[in-house]
């Protein structure tokens, strides 16, 4: 039985993600050393790299060079936008992003800074050190455990706010970054989690979609060593809770960066105007935060 709020719940089986909210990454740049390939192939390649990076998590200390090279390859084939202009108000600061530098893959994970001296970076949040986790003779390895946290989305208080778009970001990129930075998996469940409302009505009651009868909520899942899993879940909860608190658009720097990224992906980003107003080149229909779910290309 799942508990609401921020309580930990052990799960015997991994929760399989629903295809209705899994948006693929897009916008990859071609490597000068690789022949051009269709976007679907590049997206598939990056997905495989991210999966391999997650599997290598427990072996950072014994295979640091492999992890470092894999991180460089992920960064090379991806085209995540420059986030160095996030101001104080961006939730990514809570994930250890430097205040005056780019958010790159070698600095995304706070835990990676503890596990791999090659990737060490300063972070305001430090979980328990995994020294003794693996590769240290004479010390027992902590067991791998699975925990899930449920966060209810306050749609009753803010019925017109597009929380799903805020969490996913342009083409799902924001959610991917959160998962990579926290080593947790994030699932959007409940009423309103399906982009197509007509399709959602058809899916209600079918096996695997029982959650559509529940209020909109977010599940944060982690399967990690017992001595570090709570700290990583806390990082994910802290970040996602900040996204579930609507704020004035003039102060919402996170939304502003997402809008810029969306414009860049659509090829409509122009030079910034000296006016402090929010990117005039972006039409309201392009915003992932409109009351109606922004259309997302697959």
From Swiss-Prot:
Domain KH: 152-219
Top-level lineage group: Eukaryota
Cellular location(s): Nucleus
Organism of this sequence: Arabidopsis thaliana
Region of interest: Disordered: 266-298
Modified residues (Phosphoserine): 273, 287
Protein name per the record: KH domain-containing protein At1g09660/At1g09670
InterPro entries reported for this sequence: BBP-like (IPR045071), KH_1_KHDC4/BBP-like (IPR055256), KH_dom (IPR004087), KH_dom_type_1_sf (IPR036612), STAR_dimer (IPR032377)
GO MF terms, alphabetically ordered: RNA binding
Keywords, ordered alphabetically: Nucleus, Phosphoprotein, RNA-binding
One GO cellular component term: nucleus
Biased segments, Low complexity type: 274-288
């Amino acid at each position: 039985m799942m508990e609401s709020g921020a309580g930990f719940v052990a799960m015997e089986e991994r929760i399989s993600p629903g295809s209705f909210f899994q948006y693929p990454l897009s916008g990859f740049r071609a490597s000068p050393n690789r022949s051009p390939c269709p976007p679907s192939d590049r997206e598939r390649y990056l997905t495989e790299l991210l999966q391999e990076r997650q599997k290598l998590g427990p072996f950072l200390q014994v295979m640091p060079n492999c992890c470092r090279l894999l991180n460089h390859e992920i960064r090379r084939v991806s085209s995540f936008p420059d986030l160095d202009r996030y101001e104080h108000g961006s939730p990514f600061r809570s994930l250890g992003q430097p205040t005056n530098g780019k958010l790159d893959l070698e600095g995304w994970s706070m835990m990676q800074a503890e596990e791999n001296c090659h990737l060490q970076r300063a972070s305001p949040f430090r979980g328990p050190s995994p020294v003794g986790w693996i590769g240290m003779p004479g010390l027992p390895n902590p067991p791998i455990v699975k925990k899930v946290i449920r966060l209810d989305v306050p749609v009753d208080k803010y019925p017109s706010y597009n929380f799903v778009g805020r969490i996913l970001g342009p083409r799902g990129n924001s959610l991917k970054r959160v998962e990579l930075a926290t080593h947790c998996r994030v699932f959007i469940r409940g009423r309103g989690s399906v982009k197509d409302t007509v399709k959602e009505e058809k899916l209600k009651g079918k096996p695997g979609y029982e959650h559509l009868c529940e209020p909109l909520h977010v599940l944060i899942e982690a399967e990690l060593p017992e001595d570090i899993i709570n700290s990583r879940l806390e990082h994910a909860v802290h970040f996602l809770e900040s996204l579930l608190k609507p704020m004035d658009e003039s102060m919402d720097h996170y939304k502003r960066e997402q809008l810029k990224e969306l414009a860049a992906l659509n090829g409509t980003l122009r030079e910034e105007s000296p006016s402090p107003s929010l990117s005039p080149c972006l039409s309201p229909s392009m915003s992932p935060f409109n009351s109606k779910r922004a259309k997302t290309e697959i």
